[in-house]
Amino acid sequence: MAVKRHTAKPEAETSANESKLASFCGWEGDTLILNVLGTPGAKKTVIGKPKGNQLKISVTASPENGKATDYMVKFLAGEFGVTTKDITVVFGQFNIHKQLRIKAPKKLPSVIAKQLAEQN
């Protein structure tokens, strides 16, 4: 059975690559858009709970020159069953507020699968 995917509609003030979502995640074709609230320098690297329109993700890497974001992308690549090249940081490379585009994820972490199921 095919997965039903909704297209997020960018609003006027968003750039060509930036999407506004009703929740922390949504589909644009086969690409998953994910709004993230990152926590660098954490004790454990984990996908946390939603906080507003962002998903909390903690990483152990320090917040120096985008290292925490790079580490987060590597971690999420494993969680979604994709390569790091399949994940694009739309904005927030050097900030805790990020938007990621994950092309054709092969698996979904439970918190994301639950949110997407509720959107359908």
Each predicted region: which residue ranges?
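Contiguous, often N-terminal, cationic amphipathic patches that form binding interfaces
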Residues: 1-74, 82-84, 88-94, 99-120
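The alpha-helix within a helix-turn-helix
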Residues: 77
